[in-house]
Amino acid sequence: MSYLFSSESVSEGHPDKVADQISDAILDQFLAYDDKAHCAVESFVTTGQVVIMGEVRSAEYIDLATIARRTINKIGYTKSEYQFDGNSCGILTAIHEQSDDINRGVEREEDENQGAGDQGMMFGYACNETENYMPVSLDLAQLIMKTLADIRKEGKEMTYLRPDSKSQVTIEYSDDNIPQRIDTIVLSTQHDDFIKKSNGEDDDDAMLAKIREDVINILIPRVKTHLSDKVLALFNDDIKYFVNPTGKFVIGGPHGDTGLTGRKIIVDTYGGKGAHGGGAFSGKDSSKVDRSAAYATRYIAKNMVAAGVADEMLVQVSYAIGVAEPVSIYVNTYGRSHVNMADSEIAKKIAEMFDLRPKAIERQLKLRQPMFFETAAYGHMGRKNEVVEKTFTSRYHEAKTMKVELFTWEKLDKVDEIKKAFGL
């Protein structure tokens, strides 16, 4: 019997994502000038106000307010009518030095023995539903949000768009877990009051009709241009569209809802598929295994599925604070393995093939680069691995331009080694 499964995404202008991007922009600025910096930076955004909190250990001084304003403006909050804009919002900073007790557990005389920054369990997941080994429901929801933001920033079509928006995609699966079709697309987008009645009042019905028409005739066709034939085949004439189903959406962003770093962890990962250990990513440097081990387990799961070990795989790793070696490694192939091995045997093989000590993960995935701002919107997983040039400026330092490799955990450079190890 078929079943339905849904995933959601949010835009870069969603309040929680504004907070995530501020936190990761600050992290990148520290790493650009001090690649040994330890950071745990939280941001809070509301009407006309940003609060930046957390713990940092670094030899460098960073202008937090300038980075926050630059980030907010880049997202698109540049107008006073939004009641939250980068040029005029108040910014309060409450950053203090990382605890000596925590630092003592992380730092070691030998880098290889660097302990985990905290206890906890982290998960990585991959499946063969899409070319980037992500759940198709989340992949589509993320792409809808990214494409809508591109349209907004181009300023040629749908010129009424404002930065805050959300999407949700529901997929019908067969009883053997194969995507069959798109059942429902939900989209809520912030917008201007752009149609008036003859008496000067807002014409809500006309605005909503226009937004729905543009979503179906402008946004969705552009989304389709980025899709493989396999995913395109899921579109059909019976898709249910819910566009701004509560009515007009003019008040939004941090003025409409308070935003906080780390509140979109399912959007950041697998859209409800797989599992999540509960630890957020943004604002944390790679000594925090909440982040680095989640990337490492994604790297493992993706390469394993790409190598043909299984059609779907979940990898869990756990740590004790201050201890380098993982406490446990767990694998679940959901009965979709292609090798004559129990999942526990696959887990043992992974432990032999991959070094999951925090310092080894940092080195393998190059996590001491200022590479994190790009992860803070539209998902940390399933993104394009590429080298980009980034420039960092500061009133306290000379401008610094450097090449940075993004999304290193999305590389498929272990496939041949895995095939050989598993006899595939």
Task: Outline where the language-model segments fall.
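C-terminal catalytic subdomain
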Residues: I265, Y270-L314, E325-N332
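A short glycine-rich, hydrophobically flanked beta-strand micro-motif that places a catalytic Asp/Glu
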Residues: A37-V41, S165-I171, I239-V243, V309-A320
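Glycine-rich, mobile lid/loop segments that gate access to catalytic sites or pores
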Residues: S6, T66, N73-Y77, E81-I251, ...
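Alpha-helical support elements that line or immediately flank enzyme active sites
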Residues: E12-L31, E129-K146, K284-G308
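Conserved phosphate/anionic-ligand binding catalytic regions in large, soluble enzymes, centered on
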Residues: E8-V10, H14-A19, G115-T130, V250-A275, ...
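N-terminal, positively charged regions that mediate nucleic acid binding
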Residues: M1-A40, G155, V415, A421
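Internal helix-turn-beta structural module
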Residues: T46, A310-E312, Y319-L424
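Short, charge-patterned binding micro-sites
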Residues: A40-S58, I321-E325
